[in-house]
UniProtKB/Swiss-Prot annotation:
Keywords: Ribonucleoprotein, Ribosomal protein
PROSITE patterns found in the cross-reference section: RIBOSOMAL_S26E
Pfam families given in the database record: Ribosomal_S26e
Annotated protein name in UniProt: Small ribosomal subunit protein eS26
PANTHER family for this protein: 40S RIBOSOMAL PROTEIN S26
GO CC annotation terms, alphabetical: cytosolic small ribosomal subunit
Organism of derivation: Schizophyllum commune (Split gill fungus)
Family: Belongs to the eukaryotic ribosomal protein eS26 family.
Ranges where the record places region Disordered: 88-107
Gene Ontology molecular-function annotations: mRNA binding; structural constituent of ribosome
Membrane-crossing segments per the record: none
Protein encoded by which gene: RPS26
């Protein structure tokens, strides 16, 4: 029978058994190596309230702590919530991570456009 993926959709490769984790969205049991894992860093306080808290704080320059959360999704929830996307047969063979999203002034910046702007700015300085 034909094989859809080289790794069979998991990262086990020779281990007999791996532990299970629960999906953060639907609580489905999914193998730890098959789960789509994401590490999120968020502020404990929403952005609208940060200034109010810093104004009311007794301590100057008080750093509000962040939430560090490791999220694990089952495959169906990850696809449904657009954490990962369905790729073509040729696209599935590409194992390189997708380009990092860059932000500038609160907006997403295309990496190719950002590199061109940096090169143009460097040429203007010389």
């Amino acid at each position: 029978m034909t094989k859809k993926r080289r790794n069979g959709g998991r990262n086990k490769s020779g281990r007999g058994h791996v532990t299970f984790v629960r999906c953060s969205n639907c609580s489905r049991c999914v193998a730890k190596d098959k789960a789509i894992k994401r590490f999120t860093v968020r502020n404990m306080v929403e952005s609208a309230a940060i200034r109010d808290i810093s104004d009311a704080s007794v301590y100057p320059e008080y750093a509000i702590p962040k939430l560090y959360i490791k999220i694990a999704y089952c495959v169906s929830c990850a696809i449904h919530s657009h954490v990962v996307r369905v790729r073509s047969r040729e696209g599935r063979r590409n194992r390189a991570p997708p380009p990092r999203v860059r932000w500038k002034d609160g907006k997403k910046v295309n990496p190719a456009v950002a590199a061109a702007e940096d090169a143009k700015a460097a040429a203007a300085r010389t």
